[in-house]
Amino acid sequence: SGSPERFMSMMDGKKRQIDEEIRRLKNMKRFILHEEESVQLAMKAALDEPRLVERDREYLLVSDISAGSERKAAVEIAEHVRMQEKYHDTVGAVGSIYLGEDMDRGIYDRYVKVYTRLDKKTASRRVQSRPEGVYVELYSRGHLWDMEKPYRLISAFAGERGTRQGQTSHDALTLDHQTE
C-alpha cells in the first residue's frame, strides 16, 4: 500500500502529462486550421500570377541544410521539425530558402535552409525575424525542388516594376498535398 503522499505525487505527474497532451493537441489543431486556410487560399488564388503582398514582421525558426546529400538533408529537416515541436511549441508547414545567386546561375533545386513560422518571438539563436514590408508572392503548382518557373515569373514581375529582388533568398512554402 502506497502512502497518500506518493499517490498525490503520482496524480501530479498524471495531470502534467494530460496538460502536455492537451497543449500538443491544441497545437496540432491550430496547425490543421492554418493548413486548411492556406489550401483554401491557394485554391482560390490565380496560379502563376505574381502579386505584391504587404506582410507584417514574422519570426522564423531557421535551420541550415547540407547541400549534396539528400539523406543528410532529410535527417536535418526531421531534426528541424522535432525542434520546432519540442522547443517552440509550434507545428507548422516547413518552408525552404534558396539563394538568389544560385537561381541566377540556373541552379533551381538547391535549398540552403528550412524554416517554420512561429506565433511569437522566442529567444533562440535559430530564430530570425523577417521584416515587415511588401513582398512578391506567387502560387504555383509544382515540386519544392524545381523553382525555375516561379523564379522566372517573379524575376520578370520584379523587372517590369524596376524592383530590386531580395538579395539572397527566395522561399517556398510548400503544401505537399497541393502539388501534383
Predicted regions and their residues:
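A solvent-exposed interaction/effector surface
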Residues: 4-180
